[in-house]
A protein has these predicted regions:
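Structured loop/turn residues at beta-strand edges in well-structured enzyme cores
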Residues: 12, 87, 105, 141, ...
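Tryptophan-centric aromatic hotspots in well-structured domains and transmembrane helices
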Residues: 51-54, 110-114, 161, 165
Length: 195
């Protein structure tokens, strides 16, 4: 099956969320902070969470870690399950980019949390970078929301990826969820992670 087949065939499930972090290498960063918030609050227990992982070993590791949560599943990047999830999840949360073939459906909500504060040249601010930059530009342009920690990041992303005036979504200068997770962690939370 191809992505185009799944795109045409599958309906969007309003209670499903897909999370992707750096091509599925880990469960970290702002998508993970959002996931933890949603799984810990009763109001969101109806949601099903699907995480993208990069390999069978990563898949098995996280399945074991989250086996107590029946509403959490994992898909290996570029698998049929991944293609299906890309076309059926209502909410898509990514800290980088989805593949170049990805096309957001009209009734999907794409939240890009990006993964840092730009203190270097990026995007089209780097000479001769159009080919390397085009998928990132496209991902930003199709996102509904870009989460930004501050005005500096908003300005740099907007300029480096030439988003204005064509970007139809919204920059949310609300800080990165990952920082809330860090600041609000208790000593017990930290000890559990480190053990």
């Amino acid at each position: 099956m191809t992505y185009a087949h799944y795109y045409e065939k599958n309906n969007v499930n309003p209670s499903h969320i897909l999370y992707q972090v750096t091509d599925g290498k880990s469960m970290t960063d702002s998508p993970y902070a959002i996931f933890l918030y949603l799984t810990r609050h009763k109001a969101y227990q109806h949601l099903h969470h699907t995480w993208v992982v990069d390999s069978e070993s990563t898949d098995q590791h996280y399945r074991n870690q989250f086996q107590h949560l029946s509403h959490v599943s994992f898909v290996i990047k570029e698998s049929k399950s991944y293609l299906k999830a890309l076309t059926t999840c209502k909410y898509l949360i990514n800290n980088a980019t989805f593949p170049a073939y990805f096309t957001k459906k009209e009734n999907q909500v794409y939240i890009n949390t990006w993964h840092g504060t730009p203190l270097k040249h990026m995007g089209l601010d780097i000479p001769h970078s159009l080919i390397k930059t085009q998928n990132t530009m496209r991902n930003f342009l199709i996102s509904d929301y870009i989460i930004s920690p501050n005005k500096h990041t908003t300005t740099i992303l907007d300029h480096a990826f030439k988003l204005s005036p064509i970007y139809q979504g919204n920059f949310l200068e609300i800080g990165y969820p990952r920082l809330d997770l860090t600041i609000n962690s208790t000593e017990a939370d930290i000890r559990k992670v480190l053990s």
